[in-house]
């Protein structure tokens, strides 16, 4: 059953009142396909229908596009943080075997890379993100073993211990280091007394 022009226009008006713009556009499309010249009211209904149909899709597209851009930026930042962490790791490994001025340079490079990774991870990652936890572990090892600094213990002691599957192993390693280093420090204090 095909509707005549006046029924389709009435259907479009009802669809507009119900804010069903896809139905409104379909009704007005059917009016135009009949081949008759459109009145001002019909042209207005057609315009309103398509403006709202397209507007809703444009709005949805903007939201999706914005989310994609934020996600891409976040992924790039996380990747950058991971790469700085790796750079810090490799310079730390070099500083373990270097000597003299070369050791100072590798220690400095390692610390700079870890610090960059740390700043990025604070802004871009959750506290329990595996990369951020791995960074905390390796940076604390750097402080304790390379710089011989007790700051590593204080840093590890402030970590939040939420249980996330990917983070559990790293958090256990952090806890093991804290226990080991605390017992070593207590042993050193006992020897001094």
Curated annotation (Swiss-Prot):
The modification 3'-nitrotyrosine is found at residue 84. Pfam families: 14-3-3. Keywords: Acetylation, Cytoplasm, Isopeptide bond, Nitration, Phosphoprotein, Ubl conjugation. The keyword Cytoplasm applies. It is found in: Cytoplasm; Melanosome. Adapter protein implicated in the regulation of a large spectrum of both general and specialized signaling pathways. Binds to a large number of partners, usually by recognition of a phosphoserine or phosphothreonine motif. Binding generally results in the modulation of the activity of the binding partner. Negative regulator of osteogenesis. Blocks the nuclear translocation of the phosphorylated form (by AKT1) of SRPK2 and antagonizes its stimulatory effect on cyclin D1 expression resulting in blockage of neuronal apoptosis elicited by SRPK2. This is 14-3-3 protein beta/alpha. It comes from Ovis aries (Sheep). The gene is YWHAB.
């Amino acid at each position: 059953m095909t509707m005549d022009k006046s029924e389709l226009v009435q259907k479009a008006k009802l669809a507009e009142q119900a804010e069903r713009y896809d139905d409104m556009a379909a009704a007005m499309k059917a009016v135009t396909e009949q081949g008759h010249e459109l009145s001002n009211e019909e042209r207005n209904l057609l315009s309103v229908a398509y403006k709202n149909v397209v507007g809703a899709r444009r709005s949805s597209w903007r939201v999706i596009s914005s989310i994609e851009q934020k996600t891409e930026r976040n992924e790039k930042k996380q990747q950058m943080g991971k790469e700085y962490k790796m750079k810090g790791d490799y310079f730390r490994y070099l500083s373990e075997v270097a000597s003299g001025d070369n050791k100072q340079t590798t220690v400095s490079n390692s610390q700079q890379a870890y610090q960059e990774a740390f700043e990025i991870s604070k802004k871009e990652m959750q506290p329990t993100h595996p990369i951020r936890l791995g960074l905390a572990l390796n940076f604390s090892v750097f402080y304790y073993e390379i710089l011989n600094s007790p700051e590593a213990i204080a840093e590890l002691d402030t970590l939040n211990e939420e249980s996330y599957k990917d983070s559990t192993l790293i958090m256990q390693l952090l806890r093991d280091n804290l226990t080991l280093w605390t017992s070593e420090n207590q042993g050193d204090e006992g020897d001094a007394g």
